[in-house]
């Protein structure tokens, strides 16, 4: 990962001013480079990122194509993008001052891209050392315009691959002109929207649980089997396919597989397959967590679900569930 250029524009919606920086950020300053690069690296692998494709009528796409052909400078591109964002967001019901970070980068595969981050200003407090006739003392002071820390996510962002102009983005709904919209795909970028890998997995799991419960099957067992398939996608680098997830979860049960397939067809927002960030797939697929209505929480490897030597679920005559953990040599308090 390498940050090539970056610029920070200020979108002051309170005063209706779009303050364009006339200079790029100085990336030779370690603090500046660290903030920008870590912001890019963290968001680039965010499993919550949705994907999309520009519509042919997108003005932003035309600007990016001009930039990619070197007929537009980075400064000119960043200025144009900032103006487009400002014009789209200035009519939102609740608008705070937002810094727009525009960066040019190369990823691990040396593919060039442009990234935009919406960094909503926050209030922060710190101390100041003061001196008066009584001596030295400290005082608490407030800062009104503070960038989000690196442990805090940007409220919205987009990555654009300049080789094929594909998109990855995260956005939140905003009230603009009385309507709740996702401003990035609908107003600014003008692109399609496909659920993120994380969203697709969660929706598929919810659908799977519903089918299992309809047939009186333990959804925990079904989900644990499905998660083994999810873990395999991390190992092989293949896309996540909800249909294959259901087939793995209901292996050997054609009736449940058929019902799941029908419900999947009805769920039009769930894609047939989607790329899932490998670290999310591995973390989510290899471990299963459950919480009972009695307040007990259990975390166990998903693969153990098919091994009765480690864990078993039983339905008692009164309809309640029992969980038996086996082969335990030692219990450690945490």
Q: Which residues does each predicted region cover?
A:
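Long, hydrophobic alpha/beta structural blocks
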Residues: 2-284
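C-terminal structured domains
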Residues: 247-334
């Amino acid at each position: 990962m390498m940050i090539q250029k970056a610029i920070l524009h200020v979108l002051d919606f309170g005063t209706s001013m779009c303050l364009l920086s006339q200079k790029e950020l100085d990336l030779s300053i370690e603090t500046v480079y660290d903030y920008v690069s870590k912001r890019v690296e963290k968001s680039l692998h965010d499993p919550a990122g949705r994907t999309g494709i520009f519509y042919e009528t997108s003005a932003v796409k035309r600007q990016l194509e001009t930039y990619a052909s070197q007929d537009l400078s980075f400064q000119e591109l960043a200025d144009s993008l900032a103006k487009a964002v400002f014009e789209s967001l200035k009519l939102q019901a609740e608008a705070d001052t937002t810094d727009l970070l525009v960066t040019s980068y190369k990823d691990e595969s040396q593919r060039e891209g442009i990234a935009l981050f919406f960094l909503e200003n926050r209030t922060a407090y710190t101390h100041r050392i003061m001196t008066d006739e009584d001596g030295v003392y400290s005082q608490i002071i407030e800062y009104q315009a503070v960038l989000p820390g690196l442990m805090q996510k940007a409220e919205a962002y987009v990555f654009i691959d300049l080789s094929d102009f594909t998109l990855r983005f995260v956005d939140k709904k905003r009230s603009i002109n009385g309507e709740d919209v996702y401003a990035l795909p609908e107003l600014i970028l003008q692109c399609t929207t496909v659920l993120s890998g994380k969203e697709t997995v969660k929706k598929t799991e919810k659908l799977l649980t519903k089918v299992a419960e309809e047939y009186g099957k333990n959804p925990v067992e079904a989900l644990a089997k499905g998660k083994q398939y999810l873990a395999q996608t991390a190992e092989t680098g293949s896309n996540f396919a909800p249909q294959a997830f259901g087939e793995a979860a209901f292996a050997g049960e054609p009736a449940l597989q058929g019902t799941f397939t029908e419900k999947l067809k009805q769920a039009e927002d769930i894609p047939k397959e989607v790329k899932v960030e490998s670290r999310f797939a591995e973390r989510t697929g290899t471990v299963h967590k459950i919480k009972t209505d009695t307040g007990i929480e259990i975390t166990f490897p998903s693969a153990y679900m098919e091994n009765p030597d480690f864990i078993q679920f039983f339905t008692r005559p009164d309809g309640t569930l029992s969980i038996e953990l086996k082969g335990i040599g030692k219990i450690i308090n945490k």
